[in-house]
């Protein structure tokens, strides 16, 4: 809450509202929607960004660890979509829902299996709702980022900066995404300029998934490749 208060102080605004809630709790999200409804506020954009994650081999994963990630990511997304989307439809209001996913929701990944499974579920929830809600002038889009520099998630999953050390090998751009790059893409996708982009999840990973999926791409990381790349 203090971080939200600081942001409002920085932008010197008295017209913004902020709430503290557990997205996995349906009543918490419903209470937010009820408060907005009483103020006659209908969100133009809903960003589904809450997440939870930790590194753990599957055979050492506890039932509670699995359940907590699924509750936050998948059930939290259901709560957000179900409550706000249903209300917009009932009131005949348009809107845009933006889902923040991850590149490994498509590929899967060791050590973050609960998160990968939950994010894949959210991606398909979004795709199904794209078809059901488009007639109501509600558009759904997604962003699938790789590691983001300075984000809370990256700092927790990579306390020793291993991502940065290995970026030269796994990422063609040899760096992590900046928070500004993610926010600017989010602003575009939720704007009227992206009105015809619907049901799509846009990767922003510097080409990392592409590089690591090609059969011979690994050769570009070893000196052997330089002989073929000379002018």
Protein language model features and the residues they cover:
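Short C-terminal tail/terminal secondary-structure segment
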Residues: 187, 198-231
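Active-site helix of classical SDR
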Residues: 81, 118, 126
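Active-site loop-to-helix junction immediately N-terminal to the catalytic Tyr of the SDR YXXXK motif
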Residues: 61, 108-117, 128, 153, ...
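Substrate-binding pocket helix/loop in short-chain dehydrogenase/reductase
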Residues: 57-58, 65-70, 167
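Conserved NAD(P)H cofactor-binding loop of Rossmann-fold oxidoreductase domains
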Residues: 49-54, 207
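Active-site loop of short-chain dehydrogenase/reductase
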Residues: 41-44, 88-102, 135-138, 200
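Alpha-helical segment proximal to the catalytic Tyr-Lys
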Residues: 86, 131-135, 195
